[in-house]
Amino acid sequence: MVLIKEFRIPLPLTVEEYKVAQLFMVATISKKNTSLGEGIEVIENKPYADGATTGFFTRKIFHLGGRLPTWLRSFAPTSLQIEEKAWNAYPYCKTSYACPLLGDRFSVSIETRYEPDSGTQDNCLNLNSEELSIREVEHIDIVNDPIDEAHYKPEEDPKIFQSVKTGRGKLQNDWMKSTKPIMCCYKVCKVEFRCWGVQNKVENFIQRVALRDTFFMGHRQIFCWIDQWFDMDMESLREFEKKTNEEMKAQFHNNNNNNSNNSNNNNNNNTQPQRSSFFSRSTDGNK
């Protein structure tokens, strides 16, 4: 059965500001993750039109490898790849994830809508009655939700950070009631992994770690990086994306060359290469 969760993420931004903020955050974090190890390849990034709907289509390949937790690596290939396709027709976006090796046994889809409210709409993405009956709603609070100490940075704490350019920041516990502007990201995430014995564990891991924790950390960063993106228009942002994608491409190929050399050295020495896990800090209890 498909596991459906709806995440609602309020932010002290306008919907128009978030359009730039999100793209800046995705490009910045993608580059950082690629420099850490296996990496992300941007295959396509182009305008699209579907009837009256227009936006940008992107296709990426995530080379996960050692970023998987130990228990998941035990039955996943070391060269695991995930393909992402996204249709961004702001303020609506649809994203899908697939794994060629797993075929139709694995699927993740995310529908997102951005609205100028604090997360009060009950069915923003128009789920049908069957979907609503199994949907779980979770509110993500970038200020008050607990954070893993290993991931905490004072400069990315909305309670401490204050923007020089906007004056926003040092958000209080009741910030959703007292802060203007405010908006909400509504994200309906559907996860399915059909594999006997581990289905529930994998589906819950994806919803909790790969999605929920990523949304929480990423949206704290979106706000606390506001002075880096606030003055950007879409033209300068596209240039930033283009430059970042070129740097990621070069870094990815460098990583491949280094990994190939390390593999040869390890084979000669009869030793096993050491791999770091991207999720290791969050999944120690599941190993």
Swiss-Prot record:
Bias kind Polar residues: ranges: 271-287
Gene Ontology MF terms: phosphatidylcholine binding; phosphatidylcholine transporter activity; phosphatidylinositol binding; phosphatidylinositol transfer activity
Record keywords: Lipid transport, Lipid-binding, Transport
InterPro entries associated with the record: PI_transfer, PI_transfer_N, START-like_dom_sf
Pfam families registered for this protein in UniProt: IP_trans
GO cellular component, one term: cytoplasm
Source organism, top-level taxon: Eukaryota
UniProt feature, compositional bias: Low complexity: 254-270
SUPFAM superfamilies registered for this protein in UniProt: Bet v1-like
Record region (Disordered): 252-287
Function: Phosphatidylinositol transfer proteins mediate the monomeric transport of lipids by shielding a lipid from the aqueous environment and binding the lipid in a hydrophobic cavity.
Assigned protein family: Belongs to the PtdIns transfer protein family. PI transfer class IIA subfamily.
Protein name (database record): Phosphatidylinositol transfer protein 5
Originating species: Dictyostelium discoideum (Social amoeba)
Native organism taxonomy: Eukaryota, Amoebozoa, Evosea, Eumycetozoa, Dictyostelia
Gene that encodes the chain: pitE
